[in-house]
Amino acid sequence: MAEIAAQLVSVERPLWVGTATSVTAQTTEGEIGVLPGHEPLLGQLVENGVVTIRTNTGEKLVAAVQGGFLSVSSEKITILADSATWASEVNVADAESRKQSAETEHDKAVAESELRAVKRMEA
């Protein structure tokens, strides 16, 4: 299967660098799937979106992202997120509680994004 270098980086920390067979992200233009050999592009990630990376080892990595950009070149896919949390790091009970008690729409949306990432990871 074809492979491409990829990385997911947030303002807080680098999350992952490796080789991927596909990347799926939610952009302001809609959900996009990127495979090796894809035409170059630059996309804006939606607030409260989900990014899925399929690694060359078959692993499925899923993260909740809060805005940022997706850059695709012939050599690499780069996801630059304002904020990102791995679905595997999400405490579902805590996220549900934060969603219910959120005082702002932003806080509620962040919790919802984390819960969507967990569901996508389990799918």
Curated annotation (Swiss-Prot):
Residues 96-123 are annotated as: Disordered. GO terms for molecular function: ATP binding; proton-transporting ATP synthase activity, rotational mechanism. This is ATP synthase epsilon chain. Belongs to the ATPase epsilon chain family. The gene is atpC. Produces ATP from ADP in the presence of a proton gradient across the membrane. It comes from Corynebacterium jeikeium (strain K411). It is found in: Cell membrane. Pfam families: ATP-synt_DE_N. It is a peripheral membrane protein. Keywords: ATP synthesis, Cell membrane, CF(1), Hydrogen ion transport, Ion transport, Membrane, Transport.
